[in-house]
Structure formats: C-alpha cells, structure tokens
Design a protein with these regions (language model features):
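Charged, amphipathic alpha-helical linker segments immediately N-terminal to NTP-binding catalytic cores
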Residues: 32-75, 235-238
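Glycine-rich, often acidic-flanked micro-motifs
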Residues: 14-21, 53, 60, 88-89, ...
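Short, small-residue-biased leader/transition segments that mark boundaries at the very start
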Residues: 1-13
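Walker A/P-loop nucleotide-binding motif
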Residues: 104
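Conserved lysine of the Walker
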Residues: 108
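Post-Walker A alpha-helix
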Residues: 111-112
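Intrinsically disordered, low-complexity, positively charged segments
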Residues: 16-35
Length: 238
C-alpha cells in the first residue's frame, strides 16, 4: 500500500507500507491527489525483522517496527532539505516554537504538559517526541509529524524556534544559558545521524549551524507551575 502525508504543511512524503498501522498513524495527515512527493521511502521485510528482533517487549508489534523503520528512512533523506529528526518535545506559544529535550525518563512530557496547562489556550504541541527540525531561508523551524510518541501529542504545524531547553530534575527551579561546547555534548545524543560518510559531513555542517544560531539552556526543575514560569521568563526574552 502507499500512503502520503504532508509534514508541517510544507513537505510531502510518500511511503510504501505492508501493515495498516501506518495508514492509521498518518490518517489525519494524508493529502489529496495532485501533490508531487518530496520524499519517497519504503522498507524491506528484513529491515522490519531486524528492528523487531531488537525489542524484548511483547507489546511491540512488527507493524510498529515498520513505522519506526519508515521514519528512519525518512530521516536519512531529510539532509537534502536542510533538515533532521530530533528527539524532543516541541510546543508552539504565541507563534514561536520551544524545543524541550532530556534523557529518557527525566520528564520532558510531564514538563511540557504543564506548559499547556499553564498557558491554557495559548500553548499547544507541535510534536511530543520526534519533530523534524529544518533550516529554511536561514531560520530554524520545528515541524510536526505523525511520529509524535505514545501520547500522540502533536499537530500538522510548524513554527520558528525561539529556544532549545535541556531538562534535568532538581529540587529548585533554575535555568541558565550554556556555551556551544556543552550544547554539542548534550544535543548530539538527541539527533538522528546519517550512516554514509558524505551525508554525515553535510549533516555535521547543518548541526553546527543549528548550534550556532539558536540559544540553548539547561533547566533544572521540579513538577510545578513555577517551573514553567521560571523557564518562560528566560526563554521568551532571548
């Protein structure tokens, strides 16, 4: 089967799939006929089986593994569009995108949900787990995709990035800007790296531009509305 989806209202992706999971996942993202795809991807049964073999959880299906493989295949082709996949949650607030990332289990979803509650009616999710980050005309944007985590927080939207914030747990709520060297040490763990050497060189240049042009912060916080206030007061003014 073939599915087409429009990512962030700008990039049309066509994927060939075996299991109906993908069709359901992309249902609200599908476009009418007439769009020429920017990216076309498909994955093999061997790739699906390799992905499946890497999981031990009984709840993981081959259909879910196919979805993971397809997004990985998409990520490999994004460099041609000055874009990459990042692990993180992105909120849109007053026309700006705020990117939050953290080590697994720290609580980026919990923190971003607090933002949505705190700024009721103003803040919304662009993507809750794996957004596409893209440089367009010298400006960095975050894009929603159908791959948005188990909570399915996200939308078919995009916004220019205001700031990127690394979340850590803390008893008190503190935020500080960090230098490029520390940014590199932290952010590269959250990016999808292409495998082939030529694409990797191009990717590294793109990632360097990402680090140079955007402000990065570390937020040490607890689970409270004050954590949102402390973060917003700094991030919104950069």
């Amino acid at each position: 089967e073939i599915s087409e989806c429009l990512v962030g209202s700008e990039m049309c992706i066509r994927d060939s799939y075996k299991y109906p999971y993908i069709e359901q996942q992309c249902e609200t993202w599908r476009v009418n006929e007439g769009y020429e795809p920017d990216i076309e991807v498909s994955v093999t049964d061997e790739e699906i089986e390799t992905e499946y073999a890497g999981y031990r959880a009984e709840s993981v299906s081959r259909a879910l593994c196919e979805s993971t493989c397809i997004y990985r295949a998409i990520a490999r082709k994004l460099i041609a569009f000055q874009a990459f996949v990042m692990h993180g949650a992105v909120l849109e607030l007053d026309g700006k995108a705020y990117v939050f990332t953290a080590k697994s289990g720290v609580g980026k979803t919990t923190h971003t949900k607090l933002w949505v509650e705190y700024f009721e009616g103003r803040a919304s999710y662009i993507n809750g787990d794996k957004p596409i980050i893209r440089c367009k005309d010298g400006v960095w944007y975050a894009y929603g995709t159908p791959w948005m985590g188990k909570e399915k927080f996200g939308s078919q939207s995009s916004a220019p990035i205001q700031a990127v914030c690394f979340i850590e747990r803390g008893e008190e709520n503190k935020i500080q800007k960090i230098a490029d060297k520390e940014v590199i040490d932290r952010v590269f763990h959250q990016l999808f790296f292409p495998e082939d050497p030529e694409t990797l060189i191009e990717f590294m240049g793109l990632a360097d531009d990402f680090v140079q042009k955007l402000p990065f912060f570390v937020l040490k916080c607890n689970i409270s509305a004050e954590a949102v206030r402390v973060a917003y007061e700094t991030l919104s003014k950069v």
